[in-house]
A protein has these predicted regions:
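Extra-cytoplasmic beta-strand recognition segments
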Residues: 52-54, 94-130, 166-172, 198-203, ...
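C-terminal beta-strand-rich structural cap/linker in extracellular carbohydrate-active enzymes
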Residues: 659-678
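Extracellular glycan-recognition surfaces and repeat-rich motifs
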Residues: 53-84
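Carbohydrate-binding surface patches
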Residues: 607-646, 672, 677
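Active-site clefts of carbohydrate-active enzymes
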Residues: 394-397, 507-540
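Extracellular beta-strand ligand-recognition surfaces/modules
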Residues: 33-37, 165-199, 273
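Aromatic-lined substrate-binding rim segments of carbohydrate-active enzymes
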Residues: 338-402, 406-409, 440-459, 496-498
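Extracellular carbohydrate recognition and processing domains
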Residues: 141-176
Length: 678
């Protein structure tokens, strides 16, 4: 086996940034623009662009199956409204729909007013409500696109006899038509009555271009590396048309974008909070198209045991060595599950994610702080790291804790938690968001800033399950996590014909969101919780393939979802856990390649038939490795050409070398292979 000449990657943050972005022009006053000559970033007025009071009935609404009826005197002020009513389960969402023209580049706020009289369903006992769904349309056909939706559920098991407002922020991605299909609904698993009235959509703010500071480990300012901004410019525009005006600590500089980033050095500042303001300027159009106000922290960071430094490429350096977290969501604990940490470690995982108040492994102590500390140290006995979930510590979350151990106030409790564990050597970081709606992002960003101000040694991770929210969430953590659970979804059910194509589509997009990527692959099935619908658990091959898909796209950590779903809600526990364990051990064994800075030849994929095949080559200590995945469903075939890399062997028997450096892969449904030496 042989590979072509390889070279080491960038050795420092400063070198990396110097290679990817430059500052232009110098900060002399005469080179700075007169912002009064630029049109400010503006949105439409705050007046609703759509309003429906149903006083005129269902005019203009499509009512499939006559799901809703009009009530002319049951609305908010004794006027019109609509009603969905169901006494027996019929397996369908009750909906009405209407197309509404909007605009790209604006964040909108949908407001829906409702009241309910719910009945308990003896079959499902479903406790969530969902009153609306925004469906995006194909720009060519104006037809709906499967999975191109925006909706929100809320834990609401009981009736809401009084009129209640539900507000939801959204925007229309530029890849879709600017017209949306608004759907009002009663969830398929709820019985009773739902009244809806006064539905409006209003502009909340202009989105403009996305920009935020990046490559600052734990929000710490590095004077040698300078300040780097990520920018997502408007479609069909050239970077050369734009300049970024950055003000940091009273110093202003104009920066030139290059490959989606702009970097400049600003010198040294006194310790404390460094306030930043960046203004993205359209130079030919003389317009402001984006503004960001952020902070970094100026400080000397003590080098404590377990410190994690986030490299510019997203790699974690822990105690001076590259580190790949391979963890599992631990969920809640059952008292009878006394072997949990040992089981997780034996399965090949090196860390766990868990809400801080759920981490009880040595019994409850006199204080919550003592309980948490004892549990984190118990994890350390099993050589397990801890990703501490503080995601509930925002005002909008019902599970937030505002009083503990005599400490009062939401932020004070958060400080108390972080101060208790931030010096623990096995702490991995903090989990600050979990599939939140974008309306909660200001609170999540505040939580991230508070966390990083208190703990300069460990990163924050923020998660969304929606690819159209990547750009919004990317600045709310050091890492952007994505979870996707394609196996056994409602449309594939228990069929062997599974596909991870939608997961693949989203993962491709996350690379362009500006933050390093953490992958949350599936090891469970939601239907096990319901215990009515067919349950289709991921096979060993499917789990392996989903995990390897993340490796192709530079996942910097893996957190499998989820332990509690397998052990507390499922059947066939041993088989499911074995499938998860095989994948965890595999990805850990590949970490020297996944974390390597050695350059590798490009793996060129020629699709021959079937679902999409992806591949990537890695090199560690001169030894090549190739990872291949197939989206599924059905049979597929592809030719993977890896220039100069010959003699690789298939680990799973799906691939053969047909000529020097050319490999033929054949897969079935969700599939994968790993090519390496003997």
């Amino acid at each position: 086996m042989k590979i072509p000449h390889s070279k080491a990657g960038f050795g420092s943050m400063a070198a990396f940034l110097a290679a990817c972005a430059i500052a232009w022009p110098p900060a002399d006053g005469e080179d700075l623009p007169d912002l009064s000559q630029f049109k400010p970033l503006k949105t439409d007025s705050g007046e609703p662009v759509f309003f429906e009071d149903f006083n005129e009935g269902l005019n203009g609404w499509t009512n499939p199956g006559n799901s809703f009826t009009w009530r002319n005197q049951e609305g908010m002020v004794g006027t019109g409204c609509v009603l969905a009513e169901r006494d027996t389960y019929d397996g369908r969402d009750l909906t009405i729909q209407k197309k509404i023209p909007l605009k790209h580049g604006i964040r909108y706020r949908l407001r829906v007013h409702y009241r309910t009289e719910m009945k308990e369903d003896p079959l499902y006992k479903w406790k969530k409500q969902e009153y609306f769904c925004i469906r995006y349309l194909d720009p060519a056909t104006e037809k709906t696109i499967y999975a191109a939706v925006d909706s929100e559920t809320r834990h609401e098991p009981d009736s809401k006899p009084d009129w209640t407002e539900w507000s939801h922020d959204f925007y229309v991605p530029e890849i879709y038509s600017s017209t949306i299909l608004l759907e009002l609904r009663m969830h398929s698993k709820r019985l009773g009555k739902v009244w809806i009235d006064d539905v409006s959509i209003e502009p909340a703010e202009a989105i403009g271009a996305t920009l935020f500071p990046v490559r600052n480990s734990e929000m710490t300012y590095d004077p040698e590396a300078g300040i780097t901004y990520f920018m997502k410019l408007p479609l069909n525009r050239q970077e050369s048309d734009f300049r970024l005006l950055v003000e940091a600590g009273g110093i202003k500089k104009m920066l030139e974008p290059k490959n989606g980033y702009a970097n400049g050095t600003f010198g040294r500042f006194p310790d404390g909070t460094l306030h930043l303001k960046a203004t993205l300027l359209d130079m030919p159009g003389k317009a402001v198209i984006g503004v960001d106000e952020s902070v970094l922290y100026v400080r000397d960071v003590e080098n404590i045991p377990g410190r994690i430094v986030v490299e510019p490429d997203g790699r974690m350096i822990r105690d001076g060595k590259p580190f790949l977290p391979v963890g599992v969501y631990a969920g809640y604990n059952r008292p009878s599950d006394t072997n949990k940490l040992q089981r997780i470690r034996d399965a090949g995982f090196n860390c766990v994610e868990q809400v801080w108040s759920h981490a009880v492994y040595t019994g409850k102590k006199n204080t919550a702080k003592e309980t948490l500390l004892a549990s984190v140290r118990e994890m350390a006995k099993y050589d397990l790291g801890f990703l501490c979930a503080i995601k509930h510590q925002i005002p909008q979350c019902k599970a937030k804790i505002e009083s503990v151990d005599g400490v009062e106030g939401l932020d004070n409790v958060t400080r108390y938690i972080i101060d208790a564990i931030k010096r623990e050597p096995n702490l991995i970081g903090y989990y600050v968001a979990d599939e939140n709606p974008i309306i909660q992002l200001p609170a999540i960003r505040h939580l991230r800033r508070l966390t990083s101000e208190l703990d300069p040694w460990h990163p924050t991770m923020t998660l969304t399950c929606r690819d159209d929210h990547f750009l919004f969430f990317a600045d709310s953590g050091d890492y952007l996590m994505f979870d996707s659970y394609p196996v056994g979804y409602f449309y594939t059910k228990d069929s062997p014909r599974q596909s991870m194509a939608l997961s693949h589509k989203s993962i491709k997009m996350i690379r362009d969101a500006g933050a390093p990527f953490v992958w949350v692959p599936q090891i469970f099935n939601w239907n096990a919780e319901i215990k009515i619908l067919p349950v289709r658990y991921p096979t060993a091959k499917e789990v392996r393939s989903m995990v390897l898909l993340g490796a192709i796209y530079d996942a910097r950590a893996y957190f499998f979802y989820a332990y509690h779903c397998i052990f507390y809600q499922s059947e066939n526990v041993d088989e499911q856990w074995a499938n998860a364990s095989q994948a965890a051990r595999l990805i850990s064994s590949l970490s020297p390649w996944l974390l390597s800075c050695e350059s590798a030849p490009k793996a060129e994929v020629k699709q021959i038939s079937g679902a999409e095949v992806a591949a990537r080559a890695f090199v560690h200590e001169g030894k090549p490795l190739v990872i291949i995945t197939a989206d599924g469903p059905d049979e597929c075939e592809a030719e993977i050409r890896v220039p100069g890399v010959t003699g690789l062997k298939s680990r799973y028997g799906n691939t053969e070398e047909v000529s020097p450096g050319v490999y033929r892969f054949k897969g079935l449904h969700i599939d994968s292979d790993v090519l390496g030496g003997e």
